[in-house]
Amino acid sequence: MLDSKLLRTELDETAEKLARRGFKLDVETLRTLEEQRKSLQVITEDLQAQRNSRSKSIGQAKAKGDHEEADRIMADVATLGSELDDAKAGLAELQQQIESIALSVPNLPDESVPYGKDEDENVEVLRWGTPLTYDFEVRDHVALGELADGLDFASAVKISGSRFIVMKGQFARLHRALSQFMLDLHTEEHGYMEMYVPYLVNHDSLYGTGQLPKFGEDLFHTSPLTEQVSDVPLKMLSLIPTAEVPVTNMVRDTITEEADLPLKMTAHTPCFRSEAGSYGRDTRGLIRMHQFDKVELVQITKPEDSMAALEELTGHAEKVLQLLELPYRKVILCTGDMGFGSRKTYDLEVWVPAQETYREISSCSNMWDFQARRMQARFRRQGEKKPELVHTLNGSGLAVGRTMVAILENFQQADGKIAIPEVLRKYMNGVEFIG
């Protein structure tokens, strides 16, 4: 959530910055609501002062023995109290309307983010590795998996439906090896604390990280199978779309001491997404699934450290690709392609031979104080009493399924076997080829 001061005192400037990312702020509605709020705030304060003043007069009248005057003043106070209650209710309604609009407003792009309308205008800043050329017909990961009976889409459809997968044997082991390798790298070399977190979260958590209220249709929500008959209230939960949600919410409603920052946390979880807006896209294979695993990286920093932390966190995700010897490119997202809560985002895109293109495998973002304001996640500087908002960052380190796609296709052999990258072999009991 943006600082409310920006929507009160810098409304036109804020609207202009939001327009750079394709968001039209309803300036006139906000301006009207703010004028009404200020007017009603003055009325509320005046009524409060009148009631307090008249209340004191009751005692004075009684002290003089003028009970008739005291009764008249008490009636006035009751009327003022009723008017004050109405004014407070109106003020609360106006504030709720303003907050409702504020919750739908995305983050402001950083000055270093290039202007653009969509993904076609993202800017490549680095390319690492050279895609291999093959002297045989390249198979995609689906064909490779089915040839080795390691990827079973038919059983997944029978069990759950489309966009799910059953992995078997060495393919399941490779999937597990990837997540173990990523966690070991991030905890042992990059300084992250491994976390095990819930896969079901409450709606407060989803509001905190920005999935709600705007993106509820992208989530899977729990609901009762039948009408509730118990007197116990039903608690609505949602499956996590990313470990960013539970991990970042660790600091919700907390004040962290300056000496304890930065916090660096990582978690391997399944992620669940409805892919509501993806009909017809990537219907074949593991690229776009309802359920997929991901190793997430989260950092909580002081404001002045967050941009350097974004470079560091992105570098940690890049290191995974480099050690796996997977060609990739790094792009900075333009204003029109940024995520809702992001101030600045780098995408890492891995080379997929069968598609002859780079596909996103990691998105690393500095959320600035956008999530922290929603979560009231703060820190206290040494020697200071008043806490400040932290900055939050997150990134994939990496998406396990898409990394597996890249390995299957980039390391395929003419006979359909897959060479295992050297850094993974210790997690595969020394196996050098599968398939």
From Swiss-Prot:
Enzyme class, one word? Answer: ligase
- HAMAP family for the chain: Ser_tRNA_synth_type1
Source organism per entry reads Aliivibrio salmonicida (strain LFI1238)
Q: Which PROSITE patterns match?
A: AA_TRNA_LIGASE_II (PS50862)
Q: Which UniProt keywords apply?
A: Aminoacyl-tRNA synthetase, ATP-binding, Cytoplasm, Ligase, Nucleotide-binding, Protein biosynthesis
Provide the protein's localization: Cytoplasm
Note what the entry says on domains.
Consists of two distinct domains, a catalytic core and a N-terminal extension that is involved in tRNA binding.
Q: What is this protein called?
A: Serine--tRNA ligase
Q: Which GO terms describe its biological process?
A: selenocysteine biosynthetic process; seryl-tRNA aminoacylation
InterPro entries associated with the record: aa-tRNA-synt_IIb (IPR002314), aa-tRNA-synth_II (IPR006195), aa-tRNA-synth_II/BPL/LPL (IPR045864), Ser-tRNA-ligase_type_1 (IPR002317), Ser-tRNA-synth_1_N (IPR015866), SerRS_1_N_sf (IPR042103), SerRS_core (IPR033729), tRNA-bd_arm (IPR010978)
The record's Pfam families line, in alphabetical order, gives:
Seryl_tRNA_N, tRNA-synt_2b
* Reactions listed under catalytic activity: tRNA(Ser) + L-serine + ATP = L-seryl-tRNA(Ser) + AMP + diphosphate + H(+); tRNA(Sec) + L-serine + ATP = L-seryl-tRNA(Sec) + AMP + diphosphate + H(+)
Instruction: Give the gene symbol.
Output: serS
Q: What does this protein do?
A: Catalyzes the attachment of serine to tRNA(Ser). Is also able to aminoacylate tRNA(Sec) with serine, to form the misacylated tRNA L-seryl-tRNA(Sec), which will be further converted into selenocysteinyl-tRNA(Sec).
One GO cellular-component annotation of the UniProt record comes to: cytoplasm
**Annotated metabolic or biological route of this protein:** Aminoacyl-tRNA biosynthesis; selenocysteinyl-tRNA(Sec) biosynthesis; L-seryl-tRNA(Sec) from L-serine and tRNA(Sec): step 1/1
Q: How does it assemble?
A: Homodimer. The tRNA molecule binds across the dimer.
Binding residues annotated for L-serine, in chain numbering: 242-244, 296, 396
Similarity field: Belongs to the class-II aminoacyl-tRNA synthetase family. Type-1 seryl-tRNA synthetase subfamily.
Enzyme Commission number, as recorded: 6.1.1.11
